[in-house]
């Protein structure tokens, strides 16, 4: 149920895997198997209640890490990834949440989706980690490209430069941990940071504030851990 990014990507994945499936527009009645609810966060709880009431033999799966719902037939399958309609789900590791149920997990494995069972409900810190990993990265990448373009770089060159820096930075930190953190804050170069802060302030005071807060946090983090 649902025709957004996750719903479409999931439907395409199941079809390619030759798993029998169909898209439904409303809660079915007296069905069995697995119903995937790829709907907005606000719609998850009422739909879960309706689906489980009308279908005693069904397992319901939703994708909203911010939604908690207590039932031995309701599960959260969280992608911990940025999904669009063309995403290849066979490359994504999902986290599975809910009451431990080996028979349901066997059914889910038959779909070909990769997942790891993580417990009853995710904590707010789990979701905060996803926000930091995904949304923060997306936001700062877009801002970094805009800064390059405002300095005269083309959109194409800006994207190539930012992409290679992001990818190499992630490679370094995954390989070397805190030793892979580079840049003026990691080196304690406060004069450079101050100069860049004031330059940013002339363009966007809010962004400059985020820039300063992030660099202050990096400086403290590296100092405490090294």
State where each predicted segment sits:
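Active-site rim beta-loop-alpha module in soluble metabolic enzymes
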Residues: 105, 111-153, 159-164, 171
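Rossmann-like NAD(P)(H) cofactor-binding subdomain of soluble oxidoreductases
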Residues: 8-12, 27-88
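Glycine-rich adenosine-cofactor-binding loop
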Residues: 1-14, 188
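NAD(P)-dependent Rossmann-like dehydrogenase/reductase catalytic/cofactor-binding core
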Residues: 18, 159-160, 164-226
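A generic structural motif
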Residues: 17-24, 56-57
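Rossmann-fold dinucleotide-binding core
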Residues: 61-127
């Amino acid at each position: 149920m649902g025709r957004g990014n996750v719903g479409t990507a999931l439907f395409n994945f199941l079809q390619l895997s030759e798993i029998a499936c169909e898209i439904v527009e409303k809660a079915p009645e007296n069905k069995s198997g697995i119903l995937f609810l790829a709907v907005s966060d606000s719609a998850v709880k009422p739909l879960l209640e309706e689906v489980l009431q009308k279908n005693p033999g069904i397992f319901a799966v939703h994708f909203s890490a911010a939604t908690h719902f207590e039932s031995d037939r309701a599960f959260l399958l969280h992608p911990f990834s940025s999904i669009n309609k063309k995403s290849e789900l066979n490359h994504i590791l999902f986290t599975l949440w809910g009451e431990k149920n080996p028979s349901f997990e066997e059914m889910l494995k038959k779909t070909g989706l990769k997942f790891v069972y993580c417990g009853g409900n995710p904590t707010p810190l789990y979701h905060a980690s996803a926000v930091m990993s995904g949304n923060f990265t997306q936001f700062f990448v877009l801002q970094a490209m805009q800064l390059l373009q405002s300095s005269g770089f083309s959109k194409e060159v800006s994207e190539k430069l930012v992409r290679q820096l992001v990818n190499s930075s992630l490679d370094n930190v995954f390989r070397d941990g805190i030793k892979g953190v580079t840049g003026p804050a990691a080196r304690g170069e406060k004069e450079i940071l101050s100069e860049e802060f004031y330059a940013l302030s002339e363009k966007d005071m809010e962004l400059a504030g985020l820039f300063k807060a992030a660099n202050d946090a990096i400086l403290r983090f590296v100092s405490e851990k090294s």
